[in-house]
Regions:
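Short, well-ordered, mixed-charge alpha-helical segments that flank or form enzyme active sites
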Residues: 119-121, 156-159
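Acidic/histidine-rich, metal-coordinating catalytic segments
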Residues: 143-158
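Cell-envelope/ECM-targeting effectors and their regulatory/trafficking segments
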Residues: 18-20, 127-142, 158-250
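Active-site-adjacent loop/helix surface patches within enzyme catalytic domains
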Residues: 20-36, 41-42, 49-146
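C-terminal motif of bacterial Sec signal peptides marking the signal peptidase cleavage site
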Residues: 14-16
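Bacterial N-terminal signal peptides that target proteins for export
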Residues: 1-6
């Protein structure tokens, strides 16, 4: 069966919710009050790092003085898709950070939470549903298929999710996210991997402190190599990273 084929549950939801404006018919509507208006041009992938989808739904739908959070979608480990905030509104999921020229990710993005405790691999059915959702968002909003990033990519000093278990290669095979094109080759003499990392989208400047560069390297390793460096303050870019980065920017 194709990874992008609609499951029976999604077909049922499509038929049942087609008349509801502002709501995605492939998701179950469980509204959160934590949002305001914005226009999506990118997708940010999160992991809930909580014990259950019920706990995550409660967190994402509760007003609290400690800092209310939400996301547009939550995908359960059973593949069920919940929509909490309409696509046209601004959910509060990204926090501070930057990706390329985008400095307000909440205003620019669709936030997708995945039910995952941060330690276990993501389920196949969950990834299948995510791919269906990404295809839908790309078609309806014109979001570039490459504009799918990790929460940790845009906030590497604060966040690790969705973590090193997330199958970015599977998303790339379906045409989503950035991924090297073709076999990796040695970059030419003078190739600057840190400049390439910046061109990919990571927030780096000439005077970026060492700890922030290390955090960006750790985020890159989780995303493109499936490696968890923990909080290693000495994390840096090696020869394999340079080959990957050359494949991304050439």
């Amino acid at each position: 069966m194709s990874r992008l084929a609609l499951t029976p549950l999604l077909v049922i939801l499509l038929a049942a919710c087609a008349h509801e404006p502002g709501r995605n018919p492939i998701a179950e509507w469980v509204p959160s009050p934590n949002h305001d208006v914005r226009d999506p041009i990118i997708v940010v992938i999160h992991a809930t790092e909580q014990a259950s989808v019920e706990e995550s739904l409660d967190t994402l739908r509760t007003r609290n003085s400690g800092g209310p959070v939400s996301a547009h979608y939550l995908v359960g480990d059973d593949g069920r898709i919940y929509q909490l905030v309409p696509d046209a509104l601004r959910a509060w999921h990204a926090g501070g950070g930057r990706w390329g020229t985008i400095t307000d990710l909440n205003s620019a993005s669709i936030g997708i939470e995945l039910d995952n405790d941060g330690r276990e691999p993501f389920t196949d059915v969950q990834v299948d549903s995510l791919l269906v959702l990404l295809e839908d968002l790309a078609e309806r909003h014109g979001i570039p298929r490459t504009a799918v990033i990790a929460h940790a990519d845009m906030a590497p000093t604060r966040k690790r999710d969705p973590g090193h278990h997330f199958p970015w290669a599977t998303l790339a095979a379906a045409g989503f996210g950035q991924w090297p094109a073709g076999p990796l080759v040695e970059p030419p003499a003078g190739f600057d991997p840190w400049m390439a990392l910046r061109l990919v989208g990571y927030s780096l400047e000439d005077r970026t402190p060492h700890d922030e560069r290390a955090a960006a390297a750790r985020a890159f390793h989780r995303h493109f190599r499936g490696i968890d460096d923990g909080d290693d303050p000495a994390a840096t870019l090696d020869a394999e990273d340079a080959r990957i980065l050359y494949g991304l920017v050439q």
